Amino acid sequence: METTLAKQLSGELNDILGRLDNSVRLVMDRCPEAEFNAYRTAIGRVMGVLVLDVLNPLYARNPEAKPDGYDDE
């Protein structure tokens, strides 16, 4: 994969992770605790898949696409 595409994908996927994280905060502020816990668990799974199955392999093959401060350990 070319570096430009890897960097673009990295940016898009990190934006998605940020939006998912923000959605958890919205639910935390507006929903009952049980509903929040279920939502947070589900979103955590989605975020885990994006990081472990998509971003980490992307960065392993294209280290130049890894954002500054990204810790994959």
Q: What is each stretch, according to the model?
A:
Residues 1-33:
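N-terminal acidic leader/helix
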Residues 26, 72-73:
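An interfacial alpha-helical scaffold signature
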Residues 33-66:
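Short, charge-rich amphipathic interface segments used for partner binding and complex assembly
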